[in-house]
Amino acid sequence: MNLLEYIRKRNEMTRPEWEEVFEKEEIEILVLIKRMGGAGKRNGFWEAQVNFLAYEDYNTGILHKEEGLLVYPISDEEYENDHINNRFKDETIYRLKVRLKGQEDLPECMTKVAENRLLLVEILEENAACTSLEEILTEYKKPIILKDEILGDLTLNKELSLFEGNLAWQDEIIDISLDINKDNKSSWTKARNSMKKMLLEQGNWDKEMRNFAAKKLTALACEWRDSEDEPVPEITEQSFSNRITLKSISMTSGGSFSAYFDDDDMFFGHCIIVQGSLKKGLLSANMGG
């Protein structure tokens, strides 16, 4: 079963069919909530999801350190009244009654977090005491800083799996982010090396990105200019290239990047996004949000 087939199958499930995916036995656990998730529409109900960092079996004391999802059904009315985000607090330990997920035919590309699902039956206690989970929370809160002689100090945004920092680009300070797999340190190295390679060739990249964006978007900028009530200066490819200002670059471990430029109000404050890769060069330029 591929991922698309799996998603379609889940979306067609009624609530009783969905609940049958989980084991009948109810167990008590202590769980460390990471953050509230969202909700996906099923057949007649919504599946709410809450990310957790780890849980401990309340009766056996066995600790499960794998991240996962706590799920529970909600009605259309509850969804519309935003009854998703008021049941749990981030980074808080709860004592719950849950049902473990049973055996299920899953696509190979399914993430471990998505596989590790628990069905919420009842909330028994908030701010429960659990030494092992408290230690995990303390460790989770510690900042992870990647030090690099060229890129400087980069801090891991654990929620987004991004290393974030800033550096000098063409004598101006810009923000950078490395889009990585936080559980795979080789992706840290690849993204860092890709960013350094681009930085070492920043003069060429800066010129090429500006010219590329100007070629792709000057005509559109002129249309926006013509919609102004008051006269504004003519926009040419040269003036477009000169007016935009690089603000940030996001780099992946595979060498793909997105560069975000300030538009100097040519698009009334919308950013300009230039995308490409170190291997293939520049691929697209668009007006962003």
Q: Each predicted region: which residue ranges?
A:
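Contiguous hydrophobic, core-forming segments of folded domains
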Residues: 137-205
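Short, structured beta-strand/loop micro-motifs enriched in basic residues and often containing a Trp
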Residues: 48-80
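C-terminal structured interaction module
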Residues: 237-289
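Structural detector for short beta-strands of small beta-barrel domains
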Residues: 5-57
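Long, charge-rich alpha-helical interaction segments
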Residues: 177-243
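OB-fold/S1-family single-stranded nucleic acid-binding modules
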Residues: 97-136
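Short nucleic-acid-contacting surface segments enriched for D/E, G, S/T with interspersed K/R
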Residues: 76-97
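OB-fold and OB-like beta-barrel modules that bind single-stranded nucleic acids
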Residues: 29-32, 91-102
